[in-house]
Amino acid sequence: MMNSNLVPFDPYYKKRITYVWRGQQFAFDVAHTIFSSFQIDEGTDLLLRLIEPAFSEPQRILDVGCGCGVIGICLARRFPQADVTLVDKDLLAVRYARHNAELNATTNVTVLGSVGLSEAPPGPYDLIVSNIPAKIGDYAIEHEFILEPLRHLRPGGEYWFVVVSGLNHLIPRLGPRHNLRLKEIKKRAGHSVYRIIAPAATMPTGGL
């Protein structure tokens, strides 16, 4: 059930995007300056259609770089028993993700402003997800969006993420470099989806 009486709700509002996933309809209000404000990003859609975590009922989920909240909110609806946390460094994105969580009646969602995972509640998480930003530089991607999330996973937990094809020069090298259980789930024109499974005991350090 969605609350449809909140638009327009602030001066940055651009439009409402509808999205159907796993037979359910969602609505996302977006601002002009938020990522993918025209339609649901193809990478986000690909990730959501592929993600099948090993834990059938994850209890804690984290969406890193959530934007307007699409991935985390969809997963919150799919896993209503889970405590779902969304983080983003952009405070306007945080505002819209909070609004969209209310709009889609996902009461199990918490949205926080955070550079990387600096303000995220401590783990462990069963499932972490991200549509990794492409233009922050290889070093930031490797440390803030690959290694750091793994430190917050429970043993055997999973990190599912999507990247634009321009990052395929980097991501496959990180598996052997850091001894990660990294698997490319699907590649198609424009995007690739990967999964990393946290080891049963020790997390990778990935020291700076």
Q: Model segments located where?
A:
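Conserved SAM/SAH cofactor-binding pocket of Class I
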Residues: G43-P121, S130
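Conserved proline-anchored active-site loop of SAM-dependent methyltransferases
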Residues: V64-C68, Y125-G137, P149
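A short glycine-rich, Lys/Arg-flanked "PGG" loop and its adjoining helix->strand segment in the class I
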Residues: H143-P155
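Conserved beta-strand signature within the Rossmann-like core of class I S-adenosyl-L-methionine
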Residues: G156-V163
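Conserved class I S-adenosyl-L-methionine
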Residues: V164-H178
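Core SAM-dependent methyltransferase catalytic element
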Residues: K187-L208
